Regions:
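Second-shell loop/turn segments in exported
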Residues: 6, 25-29, 101-109, 148-156
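Flexible glycine-/small-residue-rich
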Residues: 9-11, 56, 66-70, 104, ...
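Extracytoplasmic segments of membrane-associated envelope/inner-membrane machinery
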Residues: 62-138, 143-144, 150
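Extracytoplasmic/luminal low-complexity segments enriched in Pro/Gly and acidic/polar residues
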Residues: 156-198
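Terminal hydrophobic membrane-targeting helix
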Residues: 1-93
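Extracytoplasmic
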Residues: 2, 14, 47, 57-61, ...
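Short secondary-structure junctions
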Residues: 44-50, 122-129, 173-178
Length: 198
C-alpha cells in the first residue's frame, strides 16, 4: 500500500484542505493498482490547480507535483481572473500588487480575456504594457496602457482600428507618448490625440 505522499510545488492559493482530502483517499491504496488519472482529476478540480503530475517511487511512495494557476488580473474590481480565463473569489492575501484591471458585463470575462491576450501579444513586443481593458455595456472597447494612456477603439471595426494604432506606433508618429491622455480611434479615417493637461 501507499504509505508516503510527497507534495511539491509553490502553493500560494491552492486550498491545503482540498489537497489533504485527496491525500487521505490516496493513502493505503494499492501501489500497483492506484488509479492515477482519477486522483489527478480530483486534484486538478481544486481551485487554482493548473496541472498535476503524479510519480510513483518504489516501493510505497507517491510524489504529487502541483502547478498553480497564475493570477492575471482583477475582474470588475471584485474577482480574480486566472491565466485560464476563470474567475475566483477575491482573497486579499494572495493578490499581487500590480494586477491588470479587466472590466466588462457579467458572463463576458472570457471574451475580454481573449481580447486582452490578442492586444497584449502585439503591444508587449513594442514595449507597451496594458494596465486596464474594458468592454462596456454597449460593446465599446477601451485599452489603458502605461502610463495611463487610453486607446479608444469603440464598438465596430475594433481589429482594424487597433491595427491603425499599431501602424501609427510603428511609424513613430506618436512623439512623447507618455504625454498623451488618450488616442481616440473611433473615426473611420483617422484618430484624435488628446495630450495630458490640454
Amino acid at each position: 500500500p501507499i504509505t508516503s505522499i510527497n507534495i511539491e510545488g509553490d502553493l500560494k492559493r491552492i486550498s491545503k484542505k482540498g489537497i489533504e482530502t485527496v491525500v487521505l483517499e490516496l493513502k493505503n491504496q494499492g501501489f500497483l493498482t492506484v488509479n492515477q488519472s482519477k486522483y489527478k482529476g480530483k486534484l486538478e478540480a481544486i481551485d487554482w490547480v493548473k496541472s498535476v503530475k503524479i510519480n510513483k517511487q518504489w516501493p510505497n511512495t507517491i510524489n504529487l507535483i502541483l502547478i498553480e494557476d497564475d493570477v492575471i488580473g482583477l475582474w470588475n474590481e471584485r474577482l480574480l481572473l486566472n491565466s485560464s480565463g476563470e474567475l475566483y473569489a477575491l482573497d486579499q492575501r494572495v493578490v499581487p500588487d500590480e494586477l491588470i484591471q479587466f472590466f466588462g458585463p457579467e458572463g463576458r470575462e472570457n471574451e475580454v480575456y481573449t481580447r486582452y491576450k490578442l492586444y497584449n501579444d502585439e503591444l508587449v513586443t513594442r514595449g507597451i504594457l496594458i494596465e486596464e481593458i474594458e468592454l462596456d455595456l454597449r460593446g465599446s472597447w477601451v485599452i489603458t496602457v502605461r502610463p495611463s494612456i487610453k486607446i479608444k477603439l469603440g464598438e465596430e471595426n475594433t481589429e482594424e482600428r487597433f491595427e491603425r494604432f499599431l501602424t501609427v506606433w510603428d511609424q513613430s508618429l506618436l512623439e512623447n507618448f507618455e504625454l498623451i491622455s488618450y488616442i481616440d480611434l473611433r473615426y473611420s479615417e483617422g484618430f484624435v490625440i488628446k495630450r495630458k493637461n490640454q
